[in-house]
């Protein structure tokens, strides 16, 4: 049986006003965009592979037709810059969103954020553990600085990219030596952050003689979105 908005296998703009509603769900955000090109970004109902979801469809970026996941309006919370004391846990993409991405079998992804991210361990142990999901496979993987950070190990977003990190060494480092870290000055494979546990405390976290805090992190911004189709 053909979907009600398909005639002889070809999409039609008939009933665009009802497509994506509870009584007439679309097959995907991409399907909704292809049938109803002028559809605005908003929440719509999607039914695919026997699964029924209410999804925010982004229709304006990169050709539109993307399902959007993540958080926004976090500017008063995500304001940690060179933090060396506060221990925090942040959920960026929740487990139900990851399950939905998996259930709906997305294979194209786009990460957008205004967050500035950095984390370092300098001759100390940084207990911070960041949970990532690989793209496009959505495999869970931890990201952390293993053992002592040696002379200096820092990870951050590289210039012009927010779906991977680079590892910046000092005279010695833990870059490329576990924890999901890329090689020195290299790039990781694409991923998105699912959750973050930042803890600047740990063995050798500060040098008391000169008050030099060896562990720091920065997570400063207002939104983090993962788009999928």
Swiss-Prot record:
Keyword Magnesium in annotation: no
Compartment list: Secreted
Any one cellular-component term (Gene Ontology): extracellular region
UniProt keyword terms in alphabetical order: Glycoprotein, Secreted
This protein's record includes keyword Secreted: yes
Glycosylation sites: 94
Protein name per Swiss-Prot or TrEMBL: Echinolectin 1
Organism: Echinometra lucunter
């Amino acid at each position: 049986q053909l979907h009600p908005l398909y005639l002889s296998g070809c999409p039609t703009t008939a009933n665009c006003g009802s497509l994506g509603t509870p009584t007439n769900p679309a097959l995907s955000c991409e399907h909704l965009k292809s049938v109803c090109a002028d559809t605005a970004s908003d929440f719509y109902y999607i039914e695919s592979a026997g699964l029924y979801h209410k999804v925010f469809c982004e229709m304006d970026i990169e050709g539109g037709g993307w399902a959007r996941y993540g958080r926004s309006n976090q500017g008063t919370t995500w304001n940690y810059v060179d933090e060396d004391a506060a221990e925090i846990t942040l959920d960026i993409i929740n487990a139900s969103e990851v399950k939905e991405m998996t259930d709906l079998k997305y294979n194209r992804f786009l990460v957008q954020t205004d967050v500035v991210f950095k984390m370092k361990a300098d001759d100390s142990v940084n207990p911070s553990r960041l949970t990532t999901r690989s793209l496009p496979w959505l495999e869970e993987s931890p990201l952390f600085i293993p053992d002592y950070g040696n002379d200096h190990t820092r990870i951050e977003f590289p210039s012009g990219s927010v779906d991977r990190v680079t590892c910046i060494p000092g005279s010695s480092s833990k870059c490329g030596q576990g924890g999901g870290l890329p090689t020195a000055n290299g790039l990781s494979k694409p991923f998105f952050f699912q959750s973050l546990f930042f803890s600047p405390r740990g063995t050798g976290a500060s040098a008391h003689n000169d008050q030099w805090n060896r562990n720091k992190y920065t997570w400063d911004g207002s939104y983090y979105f993962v788009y999928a189709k």
